[in-house]
From Swiss-Prot:
Disulfide bonds join 31-81, 40-64, 56-77. One of its GO terms (cellular component) is extracellular region. This is Kunitz-type serine protease inhibitor microlepidin-3. It is found in: Secreted. Belongs to the venom Kunitz-type family.
């Protein structure tokens, strides 16, 4: 195979890796936890991954405790949990 063909193959494999969704078996276990508002009342917007919806969803967070399925931004949630 020529070097141009190898570069094309490498580029296609890289693109496939980037675009391939995270499978549920590769997703961290904390992504399966339910949204948890926590006991505090410093209400703010946060994001959690919803296994049922297969996407990150905004919810109201109380500001303390809760669980690990809690992200400040949609991007953080998608990076950790979403496909």
């Amino acid at each position: 195979m020529s070097s141009g063909g190898l570069l094309l193959l490498l580029g296609l494999l890289t693109l496939w890796e980037v675009l391939t969704p995270v499978s549920s078996k590769d997703r961290p276990k904390f992504c399966e936890l339910p949204a948890d508002i926590g006991p505090c009342e410093d209400f703010t917007g946060a994001f959690h991954y919803s296994p049922r919806e297969h996407e990150c969803i905004e919810f109201i967070y109380g500001g303390c405790e809760g669980n690990a399925n809690n992200f400040n931004t949609l991007e953080e949630c998608e990076s950790a949990c979403a496909a």
